[in-house]
Amino acid sequence: MEDTPERTPSSESIQPPGLAREPEVTSPGDSEGCARPLDPAPKKLCGYLSKFGGKGPIKGWKCRWFFYDERKCHLYYSRTAQDANPLDSIDLSSATFDCKADAEEEGTFEIKTPSRVITLKAATRQVMLYWLQQLQMKRWEFHNSPPALPATPAAALTENGPTLHLKLEQEEAELEEFLCPVKTPPGLVGTAAALQPVPAMPSALQNISLKHLGTEIQNTMYNIRGNKQAQATAHGPPVEESSQSAEPQRGEQPLISDPSIPEKEPEDPPKSAPRSCVPSGPMQKPKRQSNTFPFFSDGLARSRTAQEKVVALEQQVLMLTKELKSQKELVIILHKALEAAQQEKRASSAYLAATEDRDRLELVRHKVRQIAELNQRVEALEQDRERLVHEAGLREQQVQALQQHVQLLMDKNQAKQQVICKLSQKLTEDLAQPQPADATNGDFLSQQERLEHLKDDMEAYRTQNRFLNSEIHQVTKIWRKVAEKEKALLTKCAYLQARNCQVESKYLAGLRRLQEAAGAEPGDFPELLQQLVQEALQWEAGEASDSVGLSPVSEYDDYGFLTVPDYEVEDLKLLAKIQALEVRSHHLLALEAVERPLRDRWATLTELMPSAELKQLLRAGVPREHRPRVWRWLVHRRVQHLHSSGCYQELLARGRACEHPAARQIELDLNRTFPTNKHFTCPTSSFPDKLRRVLLAFSWQNPTIGYCQGLNRLAAIALLVLEDEESAFWCLVAIVETILPAEYYSKTLTASQVDQRVLQDLLSEKLPRLTAHLGQRHVDLSLITFNWFLVIFADSLISDILLRVWDAFLYEGTKVVFRYALAIFKYNEEAILRLQDSLEIYQYLRFFTKTICDSRKLTSIAFNDMNPFPMKQLRQLRAAHRERLEAELRELELLKAEYLERRASRGRAVPEGCVSEDEGEGDS
């Protein structure tokens, strides 16, 4: 047997197999193409490091004993390894690590937490890299570990060990560009480092922590008592007996073994320790040792066969425990369901058995009290939901901080890579230049020494670069795990709220049935029931309005439109989700860069007047809080010669007195209006009724048009922004009667057809490549663009861009519609040119407007790239195409009249053998 110190059981049993690996790599310089073997057993992460801290004259490096706690993911430190209580701890769960190649002292690295930055220094550079890699590994294991199971620690560790071992091996195979694992420095880390003498400091006072003076005093007193006990037992029984029977005195010290975890074989001693053969009798007594690190003989180690059997049995026990737990949960669920059914049956029987109204009223009051109790439970659940949402917000802030740190590390990495490239290029140039013949020997030696320094710097930067790559990769993985946990919390909130709504709806249905059954009888309880129903309805509406913000990417925007469109094609659903995320991203970026300055400018505009500044502000978009006021002013400018007080109410009165012929078509189109908007699909919403009244009033206002499909979308947009139905009515009047040309919504849609031909000419002028490409494939764009002009892009663009278009459209007129139509094609020109098949082009044109997310880019194209765009040219094109279209319509009317005249002249002759429809069945 070798005379080497044995490890304590805690150093082997705390970490599961396969988690802490000790690769056989000698130095960071051999990191390229290095092998990654694993040590047979994990080692405890502990050792002496220097910590920079203190204030005033005591500020400087202080030697501290660091040890890692896997349960909390904390790195504790104390003054010596024998101290009973740690001075402080560092939370590694949200920490990042950094090392600087150009540090003043070798082995310096940093641990950055959200609250502070801890600067540490290792004895050598290899020890520093070992600590950094091990801390990264421990942090990832903590974030990636599943929740604790109700079983013995040994069984849980044995079960999770092989799985994590395989995962880590797979990850290492994929990350060859990262820093290879560093070999364990012998005698400097692990439990063997505790046996080494404490590194000497310049003065004893410098190593004392004044910040934790109370803990220092406690540790000193404990060490004094421990030394006295060691001296008292020096003449007692042999060391091996006392070490085997002694109980650990400090359960909090992480180096003490856990008796519930089986002991493993002792690992190989450090290479630097001398080896000598000793007899198998009693062990030699060490010169000096602490009671924190007991020694065990090699005979206590169990065989691997017995260990494997124990592990297999523990795994089987854990599996049976899980199965028993699931069976118990199933029995509890079935028991609760049975109790609920029996309680409902008893309540129904009691209600039917009651002969008098008083008894039934008492039963109803009992149910009301139960509802009150349920409301209290709902409030408690709501508080829990708010707490979870708050925690999710804190997690999101933490994730943002980590992302910023990752970006900072990437910037540093890029800058250092540039430095490496410059140094390499300079080195190559220096080597390529021939040395002068008269160069002295001293110059050559200095240049050679400088070259060696540069090589060392390059190697240091290369090592730092690889470490930072691994740090960025691991922080990104941790961020993803945190995002998944946040999503799970939000899903849980939504589930609890859904269950709450189910309970409320169940009792609400019961109350409604009671109200219908007893509404005609005298008494006070019908009024009470009616009041309860109204309160429940109001509560349900309030809960529905509060549930919008549960998703990280909101399902609806500020005006109620779905941010994720409901496409029919399966592949387009993924595109829709991506588009929703892009919209959110552009919105957040615009909020910081553009929206806030724009809102400040709008806030200073107290009085609106036509001007060039107002024109530019409207093109940039009106903030949501100012949009209703601005739109009312724009509409009033358009219809002030038509507006009269009481006109809208008179039109509504006419509609109530007499049914309009278009009322049936309006009723049919109400359900087709924005089916993805929650304001028009919710059964309790008042928007459909408002829209019906606005469209009926317009039908009486303009009998020439009456009602045309498409007007419902225009009125709906006005309602969503202005919220007042009379203001929405006058907005519809302004669009149809003052902004758009006449006969835009006539039976023949003459003006709409003219605009389609004008758009084709403008496309040929502004986008000749796209026009030629579509012409070669016989693509008719009017099939797509006709609806754009008819409803001013409603249901085509996302709501944020759509309302920006309307902001400028209400002020400048139809020229804005042409500008944005051309800008949409310019925005997607390259994507359309890549499509070669006409069917693919039509499929793409059907939804490509929904893929536009960057409103600033689209606005810039519309009002900058499409210039010049004179209104005079637009009027001339409209006049020319209108003349041609009217000539074509007259020709069609002549052909129709000739056909009718020719048909009338021939008469309705019946061929022989055929029976006319005018003949009765009885005729022969």
Swiss-Prot record:
Region of interest called Disordered, as start-end residue ranges on this chain: 1-38, 228-296
GO cellular component: anchoring junction; cell junction; cytoplasm; cytoplasmic vesicle; cytosol; nucleoplasm; plasma membrane
Annotated spans, Interaction with CADH1: 1-167
UniProt-listed GO biological process terms: positive regulation of GTPase activity
Keywords, in A-Z order: Cell junction, Coiled coil, Cytoplasm, Cytoplasmic vesicle, GTPase activation, Phosphoprotein
Localisation per UniProt entry: Cytoplasm; Cytoplasmic vesicle; Cell junction
GO terms assigned for molecular function: cadherin binding; GTPase activator activity
Phosphoserine found at: S916
PH domain ranges (all copies): 42-140
Residues covered by region (Interaction with RAC1): 297-435
Residues annotated as domain Rab-GAP TBC: 621-813
Domain of life according to the entry: Eukaryota
Binding partners and assembly: Interacts with activated RAC1 and CDH1.
The protein's role, per its UniProt record: Acts as a GTPase-activating protein for RAB7A. Signal effector acting as a linker between RAC1 and RAB7A, leading to RAB7A inactivation and subsequent inhibition of cadherin degradation and reduced cell-cell adhesion.
Protein name: TBC1 domain family member 2A
Species of origin: Rattus norvegicus
Gene: Tbc1d2
